[in-house]
Amino acid sequence: MIFGSGTMLSFGYTLLTGVIINLLAGVWMSRYMLNSVIRYKLFNQEKWFRKKKDKKILKFAEAKKYFFLTSVALLLTGTIWSCVNGMKLDTQFTGGVILRYTYTGKADTGQIQKEVEDIVDRSVSVQTSENSATGEKSLVITLSGKKGLTPEQQKEILNTINQGNKNQFETSETSAVEPYIGAKALKNSVIAIVLSFLFIVVYIRLRFSALGGLASGVTAVIALVHDILIVLFIFGIFRIPVNDAFVAVTLTIIGYSINDTIVLYDRIREHRSNMKKKSTLAELVDISTTETLQRSINTAFTVVLCAFIIFVVSVVYRMESITNFSLPLLVGLISGCYSSICIAGPLWVWWEEHREKIQKRKTGQKRK
């Protein structure tokens, strides 16, 4: 919120409000309603509550090599793809000109793109959308770069697309984004994400000092970076312009993913204090992950289902801006669930085991 403006500032306020309301509903309202229900004899029976069943302990820590290799392969593939094809930055971050038109009939976006590129002598992006409520059709032409458009060029573009497509286009809005404004927006977005990582490390280090503090914080952030890179590569592979939607998706994924990771760490801390030295680190993670697995999957499935419905509706009704948001969000949610289950815990085990080996070496050297 400090570094945001416009839609990002609105998203920040909405996200903060949702977190506060969710906290009140989850901590107070749900407890109040449950206590109210169990006062009745009909509901105060064992059959209404699921018994805790003995579960087979899954060996997540033993399979960490396979999880790490899978993630490395995905990230390496995405990196190579991005290096070869490049990322598509939106005008919001690069600067440029945005032309908006309303029209009737049909618009050939491929033909319009070629005609406009011939006029301005640079690459352009052409998108169409339709308001499902009013039926109004819109055409958006985006020109990235430092060069602006003269009034003569704007008039020529309007005349050309009207002649070539036999439609009645009318100029709705013309806006220019200065390059320094785009660079500032990109810088602020990066700062906001980096600061969120730092606060997460500090918070987890203080809350989970029993788990090594810094180790748990760093491994949690590594899992988050994994998710953000996956989302970034989705933007690149599907040629989605990187704009404030990327920042919104990133912050949303960070929230959901770190929540699952904290639940896992909390269970590890609980078992570690109860079992003391009876279990190894790998066994602690296996038991804790198995116990929180169903909760993580159920939560992720609910959110993924909502994101999938939004994605399908946006594709059917050709709401491109919503599609460009919901598709990366959908993949990011799946990645967040995977990283919190298969990356965060096993990575913490690897870190702690490696640290213990170093300490033993130092102790052995001192004795000599």
Residue locations for each model-derived region?
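A structural signal for conserved, well-ordered secondary-structure elements
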Residues: 1-368
